[in-house]
Every structure is written in C-alpha cells, then in structure tokens.
C-alpha cells in the first residue's frame, strides 16, 4: 500500500502525562484544506474497504456509478445510525496503522475493513497487528517482533480519558491476539494475499521451539484536543496531556501509549469520508 500524503500533516511532539515514566508517543494532526491531500486520504481509506478492481467489477455488474455503489453498500454515512461512530473508529484505526507502517516500519496487513457484512459493523479482536522480521529471508528469529494495538477514538470531544480506555482494553489483547492472528491469516488467504498470510502463520507458533519472538502492546488514543499545554521539563519545553494521571494507568513494561490529537477531528473525518466517491 502506498504511503498516503496526509502523513505529512502528522507532527511528533514531546508529550508527557503527569506521574508517568513509561514510553509515550505523542502526535499532532496539523491539517489544512488541501483538496489533493484530502482526496488522496479518502482514496486510501476506500481501498481498505474494497479494491479498485472489485469496485469497477461491482459497478459494471450493477450498472451504477462508483459513488452510488460506495454510498449504498460500502462507506458509512454520517446520517445513518452508527455512521459517525464507524467513521471515527475506522479513520483512527487506519491512521495508527499508517503510523506503525510508514513511520515505525512495521508491516501492517490491511484486511480488517475488507468485505464487512455491514457498513457500520465492527470486527472483534485486536484492532491492529503489525510485525517485523529480523532476517531478510523471514526465517524465524527470537528478534522478530509482533505489535498489537488497541485503538480508542473520541473525535467529537477533547477528552484525554480516551487514553485510560485504550489502556484498559489493551490488556485484553494479551488474550485475544491468538484468535486475531488466526482470523487474519485466513482472511488474508481468502483475499489472495498469500505472502502476508504466511507471514502471520509464523507468529502463530510462539511456543514452538525456535519460534519465539517479542510481542509489544500499544494503547492508542485519539481525540480533538487542539493543543497541549506547554511546561518546562528540565531544559526542554514539553506538552502536558491534561485531565489524566499517570499513576492511575496500570501499564506494564511491554506496553506503550500512542496519543494523537488535533482540532475538530470529527469534522475532519466527515470531510475525508464525504470524498470517498471513487
């Protein structure tokens, strides 16, 4: 999947949570009304739901335009029940997938939104799975890494409590990751993505001799907090994520927090989704 242009709007910040000394990655979405970038973002999202070839085939078969087909069958609409929620959740999951793949260089299979049974149906299991192989030939190594991310989005508010929710639900990934891996492997195979399906298979054998690897968990939260309050920390100026106390976060050493914020992100999500016409 090509790197989407909107990633140039995402700026990493020095962000902190009070009474919290574990890994925290903080990003601000500093966007504008560049139609080319917004259209590219919309196309990027649409391709998670249905491929170019399948969209063309469906439109030819039914005798409808791509826009009409997408609106009726694929893309959640803001005036539908759960439509805004589906838009918020999906654009957020794809954003964090893009960060992990294009910034942190994990391979992140894209199959979660493909061939859903309904426009607002949410798949169960771990939200995002990514991986890295230590060896170029992909032979199992204990240095291989698997990452599992739980995403929580509140795009209509600027409430940092989304981080608490992400941490709480991320703990569940320790128990559901095996089921998610099995589901992903089979779905990727059905999509014809055989190489990715085989990659996932490697990570289903953690307990097999010679197949151990490292697994990391991410609690990812996103909200419409426009800016962070700046404070001095040593000789550096950092942004403090207010409204949350790190002492309340029961987080282990192999779990980290990603936080993304920006102004009026629900409006941005609708702007992008309304462009999903082709």
Name the predicted role of every residue range:
Residues 74-97, 118:
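A short, highly charged nucleic-acid-interacting micro-segment common to nuclease
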Residues 100, 128-130, 147-153:
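Conserved catalytic cores of phosphodiester-cleaving nucleases, focusing on short active-site segments
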Residues 103-121:
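A short acidic/basic microdomain associated with nuclease active sites
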């Amino acid at each position: 999947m090509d790197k989407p242009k909107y990633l140039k709007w995402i700026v990493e910040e020095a962000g902190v949570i009070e009474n919290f000394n574990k890994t925290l990655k903080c990003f601000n979405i500093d966007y504008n009304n560049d139609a080319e970038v917004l259209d590219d973002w919309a196309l990027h999202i649409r391709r998670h739901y249905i491929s170019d070839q399948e969209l063309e085939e469906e439109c030819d078969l039914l005798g409808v335009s791509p826009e009409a087909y997408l609106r009726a069958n694929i893309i959640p609409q803001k005036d539908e029940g759960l439509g805004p929620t589906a838009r918020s959740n999906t654009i957020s999951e794809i954003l964090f997938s893009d960060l992990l793949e294009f910034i942190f260089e994990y391979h992140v299979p894209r199959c979660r939104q493909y061939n859903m049974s309904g426009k607002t149906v949410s798949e169960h299991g771990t939200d995002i799975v990514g991986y890295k192989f230590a060896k170029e030939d992909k032979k199992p190594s204990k240095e291989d890494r698997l990452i599992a991310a739980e995403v929580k989005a509140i795009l209509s508010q600027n409430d940092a409590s989304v981080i608490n929710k992400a941490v709480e639900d991320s703990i569940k990934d320790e128990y559901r990751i095996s089921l998610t891996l099995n589901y992903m492997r089979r779905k990727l195979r059905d999509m014809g993505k055989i190489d990715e399906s085989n990659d996932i298979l490697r990570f289903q054998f953690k307990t097999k001799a010679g197949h151990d690897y490292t697994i990391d968990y991410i609690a990812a939260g996103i909200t419409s907090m426009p800016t962070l309050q700046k404070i001095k920390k040593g000789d550096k100026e950092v942004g403090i994520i207010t409204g949350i106390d790190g002492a309340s976060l029961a987080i282990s050493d192999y779990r980290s927090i990603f936080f993304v914020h920006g102004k009026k992100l629900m409006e941005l999500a609708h702007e992008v989704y309304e462009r999903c016409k082709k």
